[in-house]
Amino acid sequence: DLGIEGFWNDMNEPALFYSPERLKAFFENAAALSRKDNLDQNDFFGLVRSVMSLMNAPEDYRSFYHDTAAGRVRHDRVHNLYGGCMTRAAGEAFQTLRPGQRTLLYCRSSIIGAHRWGGIWLGDNHSSWSQLLANIQMMPAVQMCGFLYSGADLCGFSEDTTPDLALRWLEFGLFTPLMRNHADAESREQEFYRFTDVLPAIRNML
């Protein structure tokens, strides 16, 4: 017993496919930019978009197949099984190693039915009003799929949040069973106590 009472399963699904078509588009974009004397903001974000297009593209999910004992299966038909099987494996391991004890387990990717072993959070998001709205809309959907233990990265995982946006994230988070503030290393420090302008409102809500 190493004292481990829970797992946070992250990055538990195929995401980077590097398909020839998307790689070709990226290198063509990069080559075109390398010939320009002055790059502007649109050039930069255009390059970022071409990099981001290399991952999690639905077209890529449908473009390759798995050879199985039962025949060939297109990847998009089994994509969520990766997260679902990982959730089940971790949940059953806890039941074996810590029988009769409660455990903490939530995952990034999963499948309907896996809520019997663990919860889910909505994955990396951004510090923006549109992402806050998207997470508010997504939460009832995952809960109707059985994942009652669910939540989002409050304040946004990437980019810098603002005091007012952090306050609204907290208002949303108070209604989620998995309430956690989470950000990447490049974002501003966003613990709620850092937003002194809205601290009285934060304190009253908590």
Stretches with model-predicted labels:
Residues 1-206:
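Catalytic-domain carbohydrate-binding cleft regions of carbohydrate-active enzymes
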